């Protein structure tokens, strides 16, 4: 399971008519669990976003690029790193530039280059490209010249630093096509209170949504590795016969719904 903690430090100023200069400070901390789903943008349309929901890295490639857009009115520092599937250690890739300033309304590109690693030649291998957008603190030297906006003039600023981790899939030459085209090969079986998804393909099957008899299937990680089985607990009240609807995500972020009946 991949867990990415997003930490939001917010400082909110509140004024009363009789106490104009008094601030009420509220500290907000929220954690968001990410379990192998396809990419989410760093922010919404007013912030920083990535140019793709995943990166497919050909086995012998000399490097791939990914665009980074800043739709906000202020600059961000962009910091990038590639981690292994567990997200506990660095993967054998370098990102250039690893750290740069991205002004508001501008676009830049990062290049991901493999530097080693013993990856299998018969299946995909999963890594994570993690990109962090760091907003300027008040009076930060690197942010000089930032565009004036509502946030820039606020007496108490809200600092927001977000991590976005998207899949970086190393794809060998022997693995061709798109996972959505072979998703029908995934089989589902029910035994007792568990349901098992079996993936006989060389692709990571990325699942954006799954239900059993219309009830949400809770998946610890929302993907099924190549040549692997994933076991989940059945939703409450589901018996041996069930209809499974699941949505697979393809190379370009496209989604395709599949329906399977298990007797």
Model-predicted segments: where are they?
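Asparagine-centered strand-capping/turn motif at beta-strand->loop junctions
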Residues: 68-72, 195-201
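Intrinsically disordered, low-complexity Pro/Gly/Ser/Thr-rich segments with frequent PxxP/GP/PP motifs
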Residues: 91-118, 215-241
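Short, hydrophobic/aromatic beta-strand segments
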Residues: 74-82, 141, 198, 205-210
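Short, solvent-exposed loop/turn segments enriched in Ser/Thr/Gly
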Residues: 59-65, 122-126, 191
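Beta-sheet-dominated interaction scaffolds and their linkers
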Residues: 44-67, 177-187, 221
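Surface-exposed binding patches on compact interaction domains or structured appendages
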Residues: 46-49, 67, 71-113
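Terminal connector regions
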Residues: 117-175, 241-263
């Amino acid at each position: 399971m991949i867990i990415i903690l997003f930490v939001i430090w917010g400082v909110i100023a509140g004024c009363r008519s009789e106490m104009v200069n008094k601030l009420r400070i509220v500290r907000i901390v929220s954690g968001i669990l990410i379990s192998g789903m396809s990419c989410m943008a760093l922010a919404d349309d007013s912030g920083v976003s990535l140019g793709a929901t995943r990166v497919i890295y050909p086995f012998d490639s000399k490097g791939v690029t990914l665009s980074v857009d800043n739709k906000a009115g202020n600059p961000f520092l962009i910091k990038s790193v590639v981690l292994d599937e567990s997200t506990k250690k660095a993967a054998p890739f370098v990102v250039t530039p690893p750290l740069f300033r991205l002004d508001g309304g501008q676009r830049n590109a990062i290049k991901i280059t493999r530097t080693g690693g013993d990856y299998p030649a018969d299946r995909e291998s999963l890594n994570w490209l993690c990109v962090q957008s760091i907003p300027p603190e008040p009076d930060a030297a690197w942010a000089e010249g930032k565009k004036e906006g509502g946030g820039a003039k606020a007496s108490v600023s809200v600092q927001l630093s977000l991590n976005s981790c998207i899949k970086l899939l190393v794809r060998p030459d022997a693995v061709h096509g798109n996972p959505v085209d072979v998703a029908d090969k995934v089989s589902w079986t029910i035994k007792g209170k568990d349901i098992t998804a079996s993936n006989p393909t060389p692709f990571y099957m990325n699942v954006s949504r799954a239900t059993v008899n219309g009830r949400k299937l809770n998946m610890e990680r929302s993907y099924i590795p190549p040549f692997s089985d994933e076991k989940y607990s059945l939703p409450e009240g589901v018996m041996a016969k069930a209809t499974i609807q699941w949505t697979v995500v393809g190379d370009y972020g496209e989604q395709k719904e599949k329906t399977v009946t298990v007797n």
